[in-house]
């Protein structure tokens, strides 16, 4: 398959070992995924609606990215044809790059609002709000603030922990957000930055607001997904768990470090239920030849098995199979469909 999710640059902290305690697991029902690969440079992004400001598509080191110029700002929303698309339990992920020396900017502000406020810009109206400023610099901060329509309370900005500081140039950072009813968690790479437990219900839409200073900001791999129920409950009632959190390098079977959230979840499940046996199934989208996709998916399933065995799960409890593109669960004609089809499934076996 030609994976439309773009690779992230490796860093000294980006290793399977560094992510060994990572607990973020993406939602299992894709709502939105922005594949920019077919777009033209200097054009307005096709799948982000700009309420105010400036953003465009550019090529950076051979891949298409959402580009916010230096000394600019933009307020934008995902182009999703629903008045309200955020459920009570959901995840948001994207990769961000900025070489700015932090001095109040750059900043990303994420507003989660009631549907009737989806077109607001530069307003503190909403249900809750997440802010990232400075990213990996020594002065980087993050905040998760609960809002009461027009006022913000709680969740003052906190400085990045020292372990999350990474000042390397051209360094992609992975942002992750988990929301489940009144609980919210914010991550940068493998580090959890914030947690709150007083979110009020009613947020249905997302607004992204970004401001830059002397350097541009780049964003890619924007993904929104609805969260699933308890993993063991899904396995018993549905017979399988569909995982989108297990990620691989493009056209390879090498696990990305951020896969450890989903792998840790599966390890804990198998560790707690010692009689459980599963088949690990690799699945691809329909891009490329069926033979290549089948081999790739089989190798990826084996890579997941190898990691679980390394962590202490008996090999006899784990079977593997590569299905390639033979079992699609969505239409391969859309970015979201392709993303849904690129998955790892854990099936209960006797």
Which positions does each model-derived feature cover?
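Short carbohydrate-recognition loop motifs
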Residues: 53-75
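Periplasmic OmpA-like peptidoglycan-binding domain that tethers envelope proteins to the cell wall
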Residues: 283-350
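Beta-strand-rich interaction surfaces with strong enrichment in secreted/lumenal proteins
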Residues: 21-22, 77-84, 160-167, 208-209
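Extracellular carbohydrate-recognition regions
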Residues: 4-49, 237
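Periplasmic peptidoglycan-binding/tethering modules of Gram-negative envelope proteins
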Residues: 53-57, 193-277
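Secretory/extracellular carbohydrate-interaction modules
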Residues: 68-150, 227
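Short, aromatic/His-centered strand-loop micro-motif at the edge of beta-sheets
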Residues: 148-174
């Amino acid at each position: 398959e030609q994976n439309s999710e773009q690779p992230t640059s490796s860093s000294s902290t980006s290793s399977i070992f560094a992510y060994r305690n990572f607990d973020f697991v993406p939602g299992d029902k894709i709502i939105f995924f922005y594949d920019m690969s077919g777009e033209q440079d200097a054009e307005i992004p096709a799948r982000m609606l700009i309420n105010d400001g400036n953003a465009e598509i550019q090529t950076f080191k051979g891949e298409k990215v959402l580009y916010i110029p230096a000394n600019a700002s933009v307020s934008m929303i995902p182009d999703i044809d629903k008045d309200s698309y955020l459920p009570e339990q959901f995840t948001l992920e994207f990769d961000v790059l900025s070489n700015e020396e932090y001095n109040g900017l750059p900043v990303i502000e994420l507003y989660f609002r009631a549907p009737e406020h989806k077109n607001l810009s530069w307003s503190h109206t909403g249900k809750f709000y997440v802010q990232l400023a400075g990213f990996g610099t020594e002065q980087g901060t993050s905040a998760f603030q609960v809002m009461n329509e027009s006022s913000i309370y709680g969740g003052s900005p906190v400085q990045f922990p020292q372990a999350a500081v990474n000042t390397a140039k051209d360094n992609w950072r992975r942002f992750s957000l988990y929301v489940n009813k009144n609980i919210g968690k914010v991550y940068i790479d493998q580090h959890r930055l914030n947690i709150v437990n007083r979110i009020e219900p009613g947020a249905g839409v997302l607004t992204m607001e970004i401001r830059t200073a002397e350097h541009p900001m780049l964003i890619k791999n924007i993904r929104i997904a609805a969260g699933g129920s308890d993993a063991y409950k899904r396995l018993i009632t549905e017979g399988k768990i569909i995982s989108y959190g297990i990620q691989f390098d493009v056209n390879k079977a090498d696990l990305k470090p951020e896969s450890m959230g989903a792998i840790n979840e599966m390890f804990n499940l198998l560790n707690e239920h010692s009689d459980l046996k599963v088949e690990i199934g690799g699945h691809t989208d329909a891009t490329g030849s069926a033979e290549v996709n089948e081999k790739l998916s089989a190798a990826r399933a084996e890579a997941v098995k190898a990691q679980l065995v390394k962590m202490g799960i008996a090999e006899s409890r784990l079977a593997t199979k590569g299905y390639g593109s033979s079992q699609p669960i969505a239409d391969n004609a859309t970015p979201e469909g392709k993303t849904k089809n690129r998955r790892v499934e854990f099936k209960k076996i006797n």
